[in-house]
């Protein structure tokens, strides 16, 4: 049983309100956490961060095979109080038993669900969140985040849906995934023109694919992204592929995506 934040700012959207109409996706609830400023000024609107594996991003010390959650709600609140980032709305979209099929954006085998999942996020979840909560709806204020396969699909959606998203954080991206032609995500990046997209990448150095992550970062630089202006890469020496390490690094992603230029530098 997942332990969710005990706060009046935490909301659960019942799956019946956001029923997926695409590609036989499994229904699921969605979790929304408002910033403290939303209680102080009811007219104010806020940027939104859509997080994959959204059941794992909260302050549950026991979930995720004992590693604990990301504590993203507490981290965002603290960074906002310190003036290191603007207040944002967090949206957690849980994974399902079809996680691999929903989060794999390349056709590595039949019946992939990443395209229906992207449509579901934009046309169902985002539309409902924008109607119900005080969001800034435009692409400038809409971002994605995820880790492992969740980071991979977040990065892919940011590229494929530039009219909706302008920022993305990919922690420990599962860049080892290849399509049927053995094409990697590194090659996907090398084939792209530079976009108006701010990208945060990171990885650990212990069984976390750091060599491939370096190649992805270098590919972005080769295509015109500017270091620390458009793209940031952090390598966590001794970091592993788990929620504890993602929790420890999450603040870097939040500051890069939602902090001022001084904070990013």
Where are these regions (language model features)?
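Non-catalytic cap/lid and distal C-terminal segments of serine-dependent acyl enzymes
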Residues: 1-265
């Amino acid at each position: 049983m997942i332990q969710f934040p005990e706060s009046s700012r935490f909301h659960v959207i019942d799956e019946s309100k956001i029923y997926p109409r695409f590609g036989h996706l499994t229904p699921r609830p969605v979790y929304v956490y408002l910033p403290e400023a939303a209680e102080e000024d009811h007219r104010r609107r806020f940027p939104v961060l859509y997080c994959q594996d959204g059941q794992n991003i909260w302050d549950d010390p026991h979930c995720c095979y004992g590693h604990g959650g990301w504590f993203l709600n507490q981290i965002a609140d603290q960074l906002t109080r310190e003036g290191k980032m603007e207040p944002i709305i967090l949206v957690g979209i849980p994974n399902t038993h079809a996680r691999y099929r929903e989060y794999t954006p390349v056709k590595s085998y039949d019946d992939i669900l990443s395209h229906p999942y992207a449509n579901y996020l934009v046309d169902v979840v985002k539309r409902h969140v924008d109607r119900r909560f005080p969001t800034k709806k435009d692409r400038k204020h809409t971002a994605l985040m995820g880790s492992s396969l969740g980071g991979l699909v977040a990065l892919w959606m940011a590229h494929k849906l530039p009219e909706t998203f302008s920022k993305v954080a990919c922690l420990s991206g599962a860049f080892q995934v290849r399509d049927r032609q053995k094409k990697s995500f590194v090659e996907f990046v090398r084939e792209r023109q530079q976009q108006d997209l701010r990208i945060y990448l990171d990885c650990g150095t212990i069984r976390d694919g750091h060599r491939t992550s370096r190649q992805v970062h270098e590919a972005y630089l080769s295509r015109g992204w500017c270091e620390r202006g458009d793209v940031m890469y952090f390598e966590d020496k001794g970091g592993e592929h788990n929620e504890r390490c993602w929790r420890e690094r999450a603040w870097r992603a939040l500051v890069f995506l939602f902090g001022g230029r001084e904070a990013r530098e």
